[in-house]
C-alpha cells in the first residue's frame, strides 16, 4: 500500500475527500462496489436508506460468511477490538474502480462506520492487542486516494482504533504511530504537526467514552454503546463552518507559514481584501465526494448505526447468549414472548396502528424522563438480560431493540427510534415516529380549554342543525303523504255515523271487499295510468243506449263511497245521476278525449285541444291583415317568404310598429299584431296556442284527462314524459284553457340533454 506521505501534496492540506458511498446495486452484495457519481449522491443515499428500511441485511442472508470468522478471531485475541482491525488485507481496493472478489462482500458505505463505533468484549477471555494487530489495518484504505484520517492511531493504553474516514473535528485518533515515522519524508515534515493537531479529539468526548467503556467491562455480548462523534458535529453547524474556514485558510497560506502567523511580520500576510485572497464564506453541506474542502457525511447516521449493530451483535444474539441492555428494566428477549409478533403481524396490523402510535409517544416521554434524570450526559449502566429463550432470539427484534436504546443514549439525537422494527419495515408511513404522523400527533401542545369548548360547541350545533333539518324533512314528507291520501281516502265526518246495524255491516263488508275490487279493476286500466290516487275501476258494458257523442271516448267513473263500489255507469244520464248520488263522497271521471267541458250551470262552450297538425295551411284561421292604399303608405306590411310549411311559430306578416317589430298571428280567428321586441308574440304563441318557439310545433297533449266531481270540475292531465297528473283547470274564477299545461310542457318535455322534444 502506498504510504500516507506519498499522497500528501506539499501545497495542500492533508485532508482529502470522503470515501465514496456505494449505490443501491452495490448494497445487494452480489455485485462489485463501484464509486458513485458525485452529482447524484443525494438520490442514491435515499435509495440506500429505503432499501435498508425494507430489507436490512442480517447474518442469516449469508452475506457476511467471509467476515465473521476473521472478526471472531480478532475478538478472542483482543479486549478492545474494532471491526476495522479484523479486516483482511484483501479489502485494499474498496472505493477504487478495480476491486477483488473479497471486497465485493462488503459495500463501501459501511466502511466509514467501522471506526466510528467501538465494541467491548469480555476481558476475562481476551488479552491486550499487540502492535502487530493494527498492521493489517494500516494497509487498509477506504478511498482511491489515501486519507490521513484513515491511519490507525495508538492510544496511551495500548489499544488501537481507527479514526473515521470522514474528516471531522472530533476524531478518535490521538497521535501518529511511531512505526510510520520512517515513511514521512523531510519535505512533509512541516505537514506532520498539522495532522497531529487535527487528530486530537475534545476532552469531554474522551472522558465520556472512557467512562462508558469502563462500565461495559463485564458484558458477555458486544453492544453499540456510542454514536459516532461526528453526529454531534452534524448537529452543530457553526463548528463545522469554523473548521471549514480554518481548512481553507491553511490551504491558501504559503508553504512554511503557520495559521497563527508566528515568526512573521504583518507585512508578509496577504490582506483579506486583496484580489489574490478572497474571504472564505461558510457553505452548505457538500454532497460531492471529489471536493477539496471540508466534506460532510452524505449518508444518514441511522444507516451507520443499524449496520454497526448487525456486524457486531447478530452472531451472539442468534447463538442465544445473554444480551446486555442499557435499559435495566427491559429485556431484549421480551419482544419474542409470543410467536404472533412474527406470524400474526399482518392480521393485526390495521387494528394496532393507533396502539403502536400511542406506544411510540409513551416511549418518547419515558426516554425524556430518563435523560432528564441522568442530566442528559451519560446513559444508565447496562444490566444483563435474563436467561436466554428456549428458541433463538429474533434478529429483527434484537436489532430494533439495540437501535432504539442506542439512539436514546445519544442526547444530541433529535428523536428516538421506534421500538418495533417490524412496524417500521412493513408500514413506515403510518407506524414510524420519524416519517409518519406520530411526530405531529405526540409532540404538538394540547389545545387550550377555550379551543376545546369552542370545537365542542360548534360540533354540537352542527349536529343539532342536522338533526333539526332531518326532523323538518320528515314532517314535510309526512304532510305531503297525508295530503295525497286525502284525495283518495277522505275522512268520514263524525256526524255521518251509521244509523242501523245493517248499514254498519254493509260498511264493514265494503272495507273488506275494497282490496279485491282494486286488484280486479286494475286489469281494465291502460298502462299509461299512474298508480297514484287510484282505487277501483269499473268498465261500463256495451249497450245500445249509449250516446253517439261519447262513442269515441272511454269514460270510467271511480268512486270511493261505499254505495257506488259495485255500481256500473252507462250513458251520460247515469253519469249525472252517479255524480249526484256521490255528492257526499269524492269521485272523478277519466276520459281519453282531451276536451275541457264547461262548468255546471255556466254557458261556456267546450274547449278542445289544438289540432295536432304540422301544416300551417290547416292551422291558420285568417288570410292576413287588410291593407289599403293609405295604410300601406303609412305602415309598410311585409309578407315573409321562403318559410317551411311545418313552421307554425314564424309570423307570415310583419310590420314596423311604434315599439319595434310586430308580427301577425295567423291562428287567431280575427288575427292581431303582437310586439316581437317585447316578447308579446312569443308569449301569445306559446301559452295561447301551445306552439313552442324551439321546436316550431305544438306541445304534446296530455294522454288522459281526470275530471273531479266537485263544484269547480277540477281537471288534471296525465303527462307522458313525467307520468304525473298536472292540474289544468282549477279554481272557480279561473278561465278554462290549456295555459297551465303549456307552461308545464315547455319545462318538462325535454330529453336528457335539455333539448325540447
From Swiss-Prot:
Localization (cell): Nucleus
Domain of life: Eukaryota
Biased composition regions of type Low complexity, renumbered to the chain: 125-165, 454-465, 494-510, 543-582
Keywords: Metal-binding, Nucleus, Transcription, Transcription regulation, Zinc, Zinc-finger
Biased composition (Basic residues): 240-249, 439-453
GO cellular component, one term: nucleus
Region ranges (Disordered): 122-169, 181-218, 237-295, 372-393, 422-582
Pfam families in the record: Rua1_C
Induction text: Expression is strongly induced under conditions of nitrogen starvation.
Comp. bias (Pro residues): 379-393
Zinc fingers typed C2H2-type, residue spans: 717-750
Effect on the protein of changing residue 748 to R: Abolishes the nitrogen-dependent transcription of the cluster and impairs the production of ustilagic acid
Residue intervals of every C2H2-type 1 degenerate zinc finger in the record: 661-692
Disruption phenotype: Results in complete loss of ustilagic acid production.
Compositionally biased tracts (Polar residues): 181-190, 200-218, 253-277, 428-437
Function in brief: Transcription factor; part of the gene cluster that mediates the biosynthesis of the glycolipid biosurfactant ustilagic acid (UA). UA is a secreted cellobiose glycolipid that is toxic for many microorganisms and confers biocontrol activity to U.maydis. Recognizes and binds to the specific 5'-T/G-G/T-C-G-C-A-T-A/T-C/T-C/T-G/A-3' upstream activating sequence found in all promoters of the UA biosynthesis genes.
Stated name of the protein: Transcription regulator rua1
Biological source species: Mycosarcoma maydis (Corn smut fungus)
High-level lineage: Eukaryota, Fungi, Dikarya, Basidiomycota, Ustilaginomycotina
Gene: rua1
